[in-house]
Amino acid sequence: MAAEKLRDLSQPIDVGVLDATVAAFFVTGSKEERAAADQILRDLQANPDMWLQVVHILQNTNSLDTKFFALQVLEGVIKYRWNALPVEQRDGMKNYISEVIVQLSSNEASFRSERLYVNKLNVILVQIVKHDWPAKWTSFIPDLVAAAKTSETICENCMAILKLLSEEVFDFSRGEMTQQKIKELKQSLNSEFKLIHELCLYVLSASQRQDLIRATLSALHAYLSWIPLGYIFESTLLETLLKFFPVPAYRNLTIQCLTEVAALNFGDFYNVQYVKMYTIFIGQLRIILPPSTKIPEAYSSGSGEEQAFIQNLALFFTSFFKFHIRVLESTPEVVSLLLAGLEYLINISYVDDTEVFKVCLDYWNSLVLELFDAHHNSDNPAVSASLMGLQPFLPGMVDGLGSQVMQRRQLYSHPMSKLRGLMINRMAKPEEVLIVEDENGNIVRETMKDNDVLVQYKIMRETLIYLSHLDHDDTEKQMLRKLNKQLSGEEWAWNNLNTLCWAIGSISGSMAEDQENRFLVMVIRDLLNLCEITKGKDNKAVIASNIMYVVGQYPRFLRAHWKFLKTVVNKLFEFMHETHPGVQDMACDTFLKIVQKCKRKFVIVQVGENEPFVSELLTGLATTVQDLEPHQIHSFYESVGNMIQAESDPQKRDEYLQRLMALPNQKWAEIIGQARHSVEFLKDQVVIRTVLNILQTNTSAATSLGTYFLSQISLIFLDMLNVYRMYSELVSTNITEGGPYASKTSFVKLLRSVKRETLKLIETFLDKAEDQPHIGKQFVPPMMESVLGDYARNVPDARESEVLSLFATIINKYKATMLDDVPHIFEAVFQCTLEMITKNFEDYPEHRLKFFSLLRAIATFCFPALIKLSSPQLKLVMDSIIWAFRHTERNIAETGLNLLLEMLKNFQQSEFCNQFYRSYFMQIEQEIFAVLTDTFHKPGFKLHVLVLQQLFCLPESGALTEPLWDATTVPYPYPDNVAFVREYTIKLLSSSFPNMTAAEVTQFVNGLYESRNDPSGFKNNIRDFLVQSKEFSAQDNKDLYAEEAAAQRERERQRMLSIPGLIAPNEIQDEMVDS
């Protein structure tokens, strides 16, 4: 094949053959030709000398694809090897690229026809600039500006280069350059911006060329967020921009520039200019888009440019208000313009576009939070009274600060009232609502959660809660007014009722209790009434879903009103017979949610009742659940289990449990009775399904009853183990006789489902039961043979991973009391599971995760058992841990790393410290650096850092009393372990990262030692190293900052807990006292 000769780079490459190879890959080739071309092109890219051919290729090809290929090779060299190249080679390449750019952009025809090529050359030039400027190319900016003045097309391209440069340095630099380099480039751009500024103003005042003006506005946009402020406010720049705003061709670019200026925030120094800018802007906007315009309709029928204008307008207003609303509200002559701007923004918020709405919603959320905080935090009795729902303010209570807060609230009262209307009209769907309208207008059960909608609901809910706190009465009035219009039919529509009820449910907990009670009595009464008077299955399903959602959000109200609670629960039982998709599921979910928060109410005799509700419910149990699917019945059993769990009298509790389990127990007894006559009976698929269903019902009840499930599980436990053993043997026989495909048959799958559910039931019970040793003694010994022995005997495909998680739960629960059993557990599961999971990274994913969870439980609570392992066994454990954290599946890698940390800490404190670390220290360090610098393992960053910190602190901890190195293989002794580890690490990293200099590696390792006792400094050192080593370049590096983000989330949760309603009553784990 002619293309093979391309591999010989000792002479100039044959550009014709290269063109044909590139064309075969991108355009003309068959599947085989494309694969062969791909391989050759990859090999050429990987060849370190290929870049020397780039100029030759660019000069001799007319193929754009070939040019791009050559520039791709060059880009790799610039990114990773530029500083290592000889000066003359660097300068030669730099000059060549600059000349080609000037040549192609100096005349209109070539600039337009070669636009894509010029753009790519610009990117290459900027990559070079990032390395060489300012130190090695001091004249770069003056050269660029001088070139721009020679022709309008060159000037247009120079603007494109300047834009790219700003974006590269300021927008895309995190994770690609060290903090020091970014700082240096920013300072250089700042100091030389005068030339760029003059060039931009000159073009905007003198040029008539549309493309050039657009390129200039676009470049300016990239610089406005960070340049010295004098260039904006002490020159004619703002006036010039505002002059371009009314011109349709420049409107969108200009408003983007004005938005950047609006988003600057640096104190009060330029307030006058901001007020002037806003005043002129609103004046021009009223002509372009008159206030009477129906913006949502205009948007839906507008062109792409017009829609972009509305989007940009939203960004401008939200940015300006975010930083300068205080200036506008404190300047009396522009207050009316501020309100006009807010009116525009509210109208834009009704636009049917998710992105536009997100922009508006984020701002509304921050504005109402700010108004609420001022109102919440001023230590003013009037304000506090208002927060408790005591309105209006009492005369004489308002001091100076309170007065300001009140005036501000007064100023915004009208826009805030309109904003409440917006939030109620556009409220997003909460997670609990399962009934939705599909694209054909049918009411169906939701099949997939939409995460974007859930995020939007969370922000809207929070916003509406702040709005409710600012004026409870207006919130209540607007909601009841809209509900009346639903009843009268004036505004009846599924969507209107949905958004209204979602809004009502979302403000739960934000009103004072007496106001909430009054409000809800009306809401629930009206919704139940609406359900009665409305005809049509779909309509009823929509109303039912809304009733269920609203009542599920207000447990405090239900606990205080037994009659309403009983009515609501009976209504849910009614809905459990309604077969419309989603209604039964939602009824069962809502029932569970209500019972969890009101359980005590169901086990006491209420006024006017003859017996507790739970007893009445158990009498009619069979009728209530007769139309439910098995999974819904399981949910129902969990709910009733919650009620029974609230009964404090043990005798009554056992009686209720007996009545609850009567139906499944009766069926179980029949099946076991038949099996005693003939074991074949248990092989019938209908029987197997019934057994599975009975076990699932038991698991559901055990989930909510915990310890109190003891009498029930004791009743079925031994029979259940016998069924388990028998089904297990059946599975093994089928797989042994039928080969690997047997495990895919429905019969084997069904048998295994029973085995898994048995294990899940035992695990659920032991996990939920209070820590009572006698329970462990009763249940664990019988399982040693039935479950563990069975696992060991089975063929790999028949082993249940749940065995591993069950024993992990048992060890986590009973801790050191399990010490004597660990050798048996090891014997049964260790070797045979390792053989299953160490052949590759894919097979048996469930076994992997659960195996390492079991090992972690043993390492944490039964560590002495690990010390007793033989050296080969311990080596297997350590190899398996390394195997785990090398895994790209996040859960497995994290479990492995957590387990490793437990091992490191425990061995450090044990008598085997020297022996363990001499065997494994270097291997662990090497493996951790390997995953740390692999971008697939970014999520493990926090744990990688903790392991390295543990290793670097060890040599000086006093735990080691012998050298880590092997004296027989190391030619000279080190003064101490610290010196050895330092040198070993430097050697390890130098050989792994040849692109880093010895000085850089040594500096990094010294930094690790200096910061080893400072977790934050240690972590930052490693972050900088990852950037410097080029392992984590232009990618999303948020995983490296995950810990900081988690701390921020916890602070936010604490803040939310302090504001009534912000965390929904259902989400607060407070065991809601409801006696």
Curated annotation (Swiss-Prot):
PROSITE patterns, per database record? IMPORTIN_B_NT
Q: Can you name a GO cellular component term?
A: nuclear membrane
Query: In what way does this protein cross or attach to the membrane?
Result: Peripheral membrane protein
HEAT repeat positions in this chain? 91-130, 135-171, 232-267, 336-373, 388-425, 474-513, 563-600, 612-649, 682-719, 756-793, 798-835, 894-934
Alphabetically list the UniProt keywords.
Developmental protein, Membrane, mRNA transport, Nuclear pore complex, Nucleus, Protein transport, Repeat, Translocation, Transport
Kindly list the places in or outside the cell where this protein is found, as annotated in its UniProt entry.
Answer: Nucleus, Nuclear pore complex; Nucleus membrane
Q: Which InterPro entries match?
A: ARM-like (IPR011989), ARM-type_fold (IPR016024), CRM1_repeat (IPR041123), Exp1_repeat_2 (IPR041235), Exportin-1/Importin-b-like (IPR013598), Importin-beta_N (IPR001494), XPO1/5 (IPR045065), XPO1_C_dom (IPR014877)
Name the GO terms of the biological process aspect: embryo sac development; mRNA transport; pollen development; pollen germination; pollen tube growth; protein export from nucleus; response to heat
Name the phenotypic consequences of knocking out this gene: Gametophyte defective when both XPO1A and XPO1B are disrupted. Abnormal pollen germination and tube growth, impaired female gametophyte development and embryo lethal. Impaired ability to withstand moderate heat stress (37 degrees Celsius). Enhanced sensitivity to methyl viologen (MV)-induced oxidative stress.
Q: Where is the Importin N-terminal domain?
A: 37-103
Example GO molecular function term? small GTPase binding
Chief localisation class: nucleus
Task: Cite the record's note on assembly.
Answer: Interacts with RAN1.
This molecule's function is given as: Receptor for the leucine-rich nuclear export signal (NES). Binds cooperatively to the NES on its target protein and to the small GTPase Ran in its active GTP-bound form. Required for the maternal-to-embryonic transition and during gametophyte development. Involved in heat-induced oxidative stress basal resistance.
Family listed: Belongs to the exportin family.
Q: What is this protein called?
A: Protein EXPORTIN 1A
